[in-house]
Amino acid sequence: MELYDEKIENEIFASKIPILVEFYADWCGPCKVMKPIIEEVKKELEGKVKIFVLNIESNPKLADKFTVLSLPTFVIYQNGKRVKTLVGIQKKEDLISLLK
């Protein structure tokens, strides 16, 4: 699901399950590599986590607010709190492990 400024904080703070937010850009090569991996994680953990993608070109203020300096950036939230930030290409297994 693509998120925009007005929704992201409400989604994060209201969620009872873990959230993974991916910050990406269409021109980002590693982001393109991660797209199918994120889809696999989403399918495997369906109903157990929420996964959102945020295009930094459409949402530059959020990229600044969340201190996104490299792409892709993955931020994991649990109980409304940021618990982990990952940058670059990630293994599916590592993401799944962190989200369980």
Regions inferred by a protein language model and the residue ranges of each:
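A short beta-strand-turn-helix
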Residues: 1-18, 60
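Short pre-active-site segment immediately N-terminal to redox-active cysteine/selenocysteine motifs
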Residues: 16-17, 23-27, 70
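Hydrophobic beta-strand anchors of alpha/beta hydrolase catalytic cores
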Residues: 20-21, 51, 74
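The canonical Cys-X-X-Cys-His
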Residues: 28-31, 74
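Typically the conserved alpha-helix immediately C-terminal to a functionally engaged Cys/Sec
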Residues: 32-45
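Structural microenvironment flanking redox-active thiols in thiol-disulfide oxidoreductases
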Residues: 56-63
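Non-catalytic, surface beta->alpha helical segment in thiol-disulfide oxidoreductase systems
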Residues: 75-100
